[in-house]
Amino acid sequence: DLFSPETYRAFSESGQEISGFRENRRRSAANIKPGDRLICYMTKLSRWIGVLEVSSNYFVDHQPVFMEADDPFVVRFRVSPHVWLQPEKGIPISNDISWKHLSFTKDLQKDNTAWTGKVRGSLTKLTDEDGAYLERILIEQRESQKSYPLTAIDRKNLRPSVINSE
């Protein structure tokens, strides 16, 4: 489950009961069943931030949740968070605890971007091994609350975007 800093903030403030996806993910959503887990990744910070358990089949709802108006994330699931970390507690994908253990990163140099396809689209299925490993380290991180300091660029990326409409 991909979150931008903006959708992370919206989900965090919404009661954390609904996860939403764009209409073009409906086919993938149809394969998700109650009991499945969504491993959450924050774009712009490149961090693993959570584990959500799905508690419903998908449904379509146009009521804004993630954006104040014209919310594009209308393909939705009811979820319950098993892990939901603050950005500075999220595990950077480039940290060895993640990088050296995932099938799509472990054989790559850290400056290689070939892995990004695995996290570019929401509802991309991870291997069972990668999913179980990420769930385990995220649960451990929920307990330990180790800090992964944010860089200046990370802090800038977390700030809400302001669009000048004049």
Regions found by a protein language model. Give the residues of each.
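Short, compositionally biased strand/turn segments
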Residues: 32-36, 102-103
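Compositionally biased, charged N-terminal/linker segments
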Residues: 1-34, 42-43, 140-165
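Aromatic- and Lys/Arg-enriched surface recognition patch
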Residues: 53-124
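Short, Lys/Arg- and Gly-enriched loop/turn segments at beta-strand edges
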Residues: 46-53
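Conserved beta-strand elements of beta-rich interaction domains across eukaryotes
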Residues: 45-46, 84
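ATP-dependent helicase/translocase motor core
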Residues: 106-166
